[in-house]
Amino acid sequence: MSDIKVRFAPSPTGFMHIGNTRTALFNWLLAKKLGGKFMLRIDDTDKLRSKKEYEDAMRESLKWLGFEWGEEARQSARFERYDELRDKLIAEGRIYACYDSPEELEIKRKRAMAKGQAPIYDRQALKYTADDLAKFKAEGRKPHYRFKLVDEVIEWDDIVRGHCKYEASKLSDPIIIREDGSYLYHFPSCVDDSDFGITHIVRGEDHVTNTAAQIQMFKAIGGKVPTFAHLPLLTGTEGKLSKRLGSLGVRELKAEGVEPMAICSFLAKLGTSDAIEPYYTLDELAESLDFEKLGRSQPKFDEEELKRFNTKFVRSMPYELVANRIPVSKEFWEKVKPNLDVVEDIRVWNNICNDVVVPVMEDRELTEIAASVLPPEPWDDTTFNAWLNEVKAKSGKKGKELFHPIRKALTALENGPELKTLLPLIGYEKTLMRLKGIKA
């Protein structure tokens, strides 16, 4: 086991979606490839929006995807630690109170924009007089708190983006504590990453500017700065950030029959120079992980493409991966899987071919003709069409009048798998009996 340690830190304010699934996946694969540890951290500082049902659903989704973890923490249990370091940094002048109202901040932002300037906080709060503070108190204002950035060039080597450089003077001091005393993302995340020994942080590129500020936070609290990897964000098929990507849930995909390893294979290779091909274990997928193959452009995620890939995935799945899920033999699975879209479809085939079917007799005259000309086995790919043509010639029926009564007799279903493929799997004896209206 190496010293490498990563974390997946979801906020339980909604269900697992494609975006954070991809983040969890890359973290897990990195830990697995480097022989490190994967930690789950519940970022539940938002007391109003955090819900246990979301947290439980996230755990369920992570386990279904195959991600394992040996350590976990939750931020709501660590407020004393955050407060301890907050007080230390206030005393050192690195965290300071601000009484600007949202309206006042918006006015400042618009003024800066009108002048063609970046809307950087002007640090007016550092110039408060005793009279100012007395006035704010009399008005009942409560402060929010900012982290004071040191004027320097902040640099790091990003696994995905390469060398990154930001001038702290061109960044606003980030707000880290709200007026109600609750913490925003930045500060608790740094404290946790430092305390739990996180060595690598893999997350979306929307956090890049956060990283610049957080590097200074790590140093301010005496922590070691981790290695960062910022993944390009997924877009919809139209090339824009899509609300659908934030709502398309793992639970929804699971309900639609999308396989967990199909999701992982697809997301791991989307936007890379590798072809999107089926991987049947996370270990195998982890071995193929190479951040250098990850492009800088934002990959387009297409839900329908994922489902098509899932069909390809299912049709090449080894029997060993489904043996404990479906009540069929290996021989039957291998014969039928080229016709499946999702694994659960096998149950329809199994019911028709291996279970007892009560025929629905829609046209006895037709099915009696069909029974009378049913050829003996062995059957090959030409048998069905030759047999059907003979039934057609003898009955004078065609189209739906020909197909439908035979389907209902053989399967008792209105619709279903192709009869041409089904017939050899049902076999001569059962086919003959069902055509005669006998339960078989």
Locations of regions flagged by a protein language model:
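Residue-level signal for inorganic ion chemistry
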Residues: 27, 58, 89, 93, ...
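A short glycine/serine-rich beta->alpha loop
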Residues: 10-16, 201, 390-396
